[in-house]
From Swiss-Prot:
Keywords: Amino-acid biosynthesis, Branched-chain amino acid biosynthesis, Magnesium, Metal-binding, NADP, Oxidoreductase
Protein name: Ketol-acid reductoisomerase (NADP(+))
PANTHER family assigned: KETOL-ACID REDUCTOISOMERASE, MITOCHONDRIAL (PTHR21371:SF1)
The enzyme's E.C. designation: 1.1.1.86
Cofactor binding summary note: Binds 2 magnesium ions per subunit.
Purpose: Involved in the biosynthesis of branched-chain amino acids (BCAA). Catalyzes an alkyl-migration followed by a ketol-acid reduction of (S)-2-acetolactate (S2AL) to yield (R)-2,3-dihydroxy-isovalerate. In the isomerase reaction, S2AL is rearranged via a Mg-dependent methyl migration to produce 3-hydroxy-3-methyl-2-ketobutyrate (HMKB). In the reductase reaction, this 2-ketoacid undergoes a metal-dependent reduction by NADPH to yield (R)-2,3-dihydroxy-isovalerate.
Region (Disordered): 1-25, 351-372
PROSITE patterns cross-referenced by the UniProt entry: KARI_C, KARI_N
Top-level EC class: oxidoreductase
Binding site for Mg(2+) 1: 214, 218
Reactions accelerated catalytically: (2R)-2,3-dihydroxy-3-methylbutanoate + NADP(+) = (2S)-2-acetolactate + NADPH + H(+); (2R,3R)-2,3-dihydroxy-3-methylpentanoate + NADP(+) = (S)-2-ethyl-2-hydroxy-3-oxobutanoate + NADPH + H(+)
Example of a GO biological process term: isoleucine biosynthetic process
């Protein structure tokens, strides 16, 4: 297994050559900040045609950029990409002909894909990602003579595409890990412009910051923390004799209503929108559930992300054909709340809207739904 030493010490500032691991100020790039001359005459290879891949490729093409989609022979996405009017080649051929290689396949297969395409990277080319895992944890070691950047829309691919077509934008992230040409950041911002991110704002970050905050958020709050909280609340009510249906509504279904309020206007908007009874109960009881011991566990989870413990565990799990993952996933799918919720979700009109399940990403890890 390749060593998972983190690589923040090699991240350098584009203009000054200084460490950009910790940015003192947050820079947000908009349309006026983008100079399209840094991408307009270049060819982009988009490796993968899943959630993010199809959005990047189509948005780039509609912005006048020469795009090649890189898919292995036999990929089920080849016909779809061609039907969308895009040229399709193998990943190796696409990378060989491109100036920018955007790697939009799952984290777990990126190292193998890189092995297949690295000989096609010429000095001055750009190796681009939408998530920093494999660079940050040293699973991909790029050539020293290429730029390494990140452009990561903060939404599932179908929304990135839909917003672009509507003349709107999707917020995103841009980062520079390796800048050999001196223009890596300008090119990344131009790419973000071409896929529609600078319409809303592209936030500057680093590979370390994006990777570590993304993994922590998924584990402690969004995917791990939220689902564990929902299940514990559901089980508490059911064990106390309340109906599973009522427990489902109170602990899972209504969570969306609260999150939507927080999404739209922050915590204050949520508190201002619920009843006084709900507000007082939440303010006085919430910290009894999420207490200092939970904070200590969160800090432990963050430490495991920062020092590479989680990365090593996940890499080993995949190398062993995912035994723990398979067992845990099966147990989650067998939980009573799943059987209770299925007929209840049919009561809502949005359950008939297929777009709610259209190639959704795993939180902010856009490559997770990408094809090969």
């Amino acid at each position: 297994m390749t060593e998972t030493k983190t690589q923040t010490e090699t991240e350098t500032d584009e203009e000054e050559g200084t460490d950009t691991d910790t940015a003192l100020d947050t820079t947000i790039y908009y349309d006026d900040d983008a100079d399209r001359e840094y991408i307009d005459d270049k060819t982009v290879a988009v490796l993968g045609y899943g959630s993010q891949g199809h959005a990047h490729a189509q948005n780039l093409a509609d912005s006048g950029i020469d795009v090649i989609v890189g898919l292995y022979e036999g990929s089920s996405s080849r016909d779809a990409a061609r039907a969308d009017g895009l040229r399709v080649e193998t990943p190796a051929t696409a990378a060989d002909e491109a100036d920018i290689v955007s790697v939009l396949v799952p984290d777990t297969v990126q190292p193998d894909v890189f092995e297949a395409i690295q000989d096609g990277l010429d000095a001055g080319d750009t190796l681009q990602f939408a998530h920093g895992f494999n660079i940050h944890y040293n699973q991909i070691q790029p050539p020293a003579d290429v730029d390494v950047t990140m452009v990561a829309p903060k939404a599932p691919g179908h929304l990135v595409r839909r917003n672009y077509e509507a003349g709107e934008g999707t917020p995103g992230l841009v980062a520079v890990y390796q800048n050999t040409t001196g223009t890596a950041r300008k090119e990344a911002v131009a790419y973000a412009h071409a896929i529609g991110c600078t319409r809303a704002g592209a936030i500057e970050t680093t590979f370390r910051e994006e990777t570590e905050t993304d993994l922590f958020g998924e584990q402690a709050v969004l995917c791990g923390g939220a689902t564990a909280l929902v299940k514990q609340g559901y089980e508490t009510l059911v064990d106390a004799g309340y109906s599973p249906e009522m427990a489902y509504f109170e602990c899972l279904n209504e969570l969306k209503l609260i999150v939507d309020l927080m999404y739209e206007g922050g915590l204050s908007e949520m508190w201002n929108s619920v009843s006084d009874t709900a507000e007082y109960g939440g303010l006085t009881r919430g910290n009894q559930v999420i207490d200092e011991s939970v904070r200590e566990e969160m800090e432990s989870i963050l430490e495991g992300v920062q020092d590479g413990t989680f990365a090593r565990e996940w890499i080993s799990e995949n190398q062993a054909n995912r035994p723990s993952y398979t067992q845990l996933k099966a147990a989650e799918e067998a939980h009573e709340i799943e059987a209770v919720g299925e007929p209840l979700r049919d009561l809502f009109a949005w359950s008939d809207n297929e777009e709610t399940n259209d190639e959704s990403d795993v939180v902010s890890e856009p490559e997770a739904a990408a094809d090969d």
